[in-house]
Amino acid sequence: DLKVYFKQKSPKLLSFKPGILKAVDQVSFSIEKGKTFGLVGESGSGKSTIGKAILRYHKPTGGEIFYEGTEIGAMGEKELLPYRKKMQSVFQDPYSSLDPSHTVQDIICEPMAIHKMYTPKERKERAKELIRVVGLKEQDLLKYPHEFSGGQRQRISIARALSVQPEFVVCDEPISALDVSLQAQIVQMLQDLQEKYGLTYLFISHQLQVVQKICDEIGVLYLGNLMEIADADKLYSNPLHPYTKMLISSI
């Protein structure tokens, strides 16, 4: 029953009762290890807020978040550190999430340094391995983010996420900023990486065709509430909730 509420600033000069925005309200779901759970819904439905709450970028207002049976929703930052290594993210805009003053090598190595993994030399070797895994070249490690296309930058973001050997990755609209020609490539790569490393994904998107392709199970969100959960194929062949039917009919 996850809840994430935000206080809204009143447009009035003086107000004694600030409004409450219920970004996520009593949402419950689970993700099977090694599988992909999709969250779909229109803009403002609360999809990204849920992803950020799971990663603890937002502190939940209520409810619990369990990771392999351990409740992490109320943990302090020190307790969370080992879980931050296990849980990584890939966001919509790869350029804004990559430090423009750092080389690709520095970007990929930084999470490993934060979590005190490997020696500096081993980090560089791992960066070489990962840059090849995501389809780029070793010489790209010495370049800067502005020297790459959007699709290439997203590949760098994925390499960075993989650097600390995570088990769970939140993919928050990872392809929506890319050209259609590149979207299928990134989706296929995410599937290949899942099979290679045994990853578990939360895949957040408003693109229903993509979610159907990559996800095992899908939850449909509307204004912070979960309308329906079903296996991907079943959801598209036999949607039950009127809102789900409306979303699918708009494809």
Enumerate the predicted regions with their spans.
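Conserved ABC transporter NBD signature motif
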Residues: G63-E71
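Conserved ABC ATPase signature
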Residues: Y144-F148, Q152
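ABC ATPase NBD coupling module
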Residues: L13-K17, I72-Q88, I114, K234-P239
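The feature captures the beta-strand-to-loop junction immediately N-terminal to the Walker
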Residues: V40-G41
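A short, proline-enriched helix->beta-strand linker immediately N-terminal to the Walker B motif
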Residues: S163-E167
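P-loop NTP-binding/switch modules centered on Walker-like glycine-rich loops
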Residues: P174, L178, L182-I251
